[in-house]
Amino acid sequence: DLTGNINSYLPQVDRLLLWDNTPGGGKEQLPLSGVTHPERLEYRGCGRNVGIGTALNDAVAYAREHGYTHLLTLDQDSYFLPGAFPDYMAAIRSYGEEKRVIFSVNYFIKSQQAPLYPVADRVDEVSSAMTSGTVYPVGLFEELDVFMEELFVWGIDCEYCWRAARKGVR
């Protein structure tokens, strides 16, 4: 349920860019009746499947242009359990949102019916983060450059985290 997924975090974000990667698609609005803050939605796309790197880099450019400090990336099938997104944002603020850190959630792996890491009420350092649910300080893109579009889909998230780690980003 795309509307339900979006509503799990939309009340706490300033803007949500919805990228349509459908060949022949574009910037048409999706049928999202029931979205809590439709005024926060912006539809983007280019009418062809360009992979997630191009979409992510479009979001980076948008964040820079509009003065945002952080970028949250999500897949269409991602959602937060009730209360989890505000807790995630509070954990980022408590840890230090101004730090050179890429923040990531602890993923629940549906096929294994278990979280990726042991559940704990703390921030742990990990070697890489999946794209969905990750929060990037926008300033890191000045330092590290943008996502590697030529990877298309697979490995974009890991490559960026590894590049960041080589530069001392946690």
Task: Tell what function each PLM region has.
Residues 1-12:
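Short, well-formed alpha-helical segments that are part of the catalytic scaffolds
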Residues 20-31, 48, 78-79:
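A conserved acidic beta->alpha catalytic loop
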Residues 46-63:
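Glycine-rich, basic loop-to-helix element that forms the pyrophosphate-binding segment
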Residues 56, 83-87, 156:
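Acidic donor-diphosphate engagement hotspot in glycosyltransferases and nucleotidyltransferases
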Residues 68-77:
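Short beta-strand-to-loop acidic/aromatic patch adjacent to the donor-nucleotide binding site
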Residues 81-116:
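Conserved donor NDP-sugar-binding/catalytic core segment of glycosyltransferases
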Residues 130-145:
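Conserved nucleotide-sugar donor-binding
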Residues 140, 144, 150-170:
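A short, conserved alpha-helix in the catalytic core of glycosyltransferases
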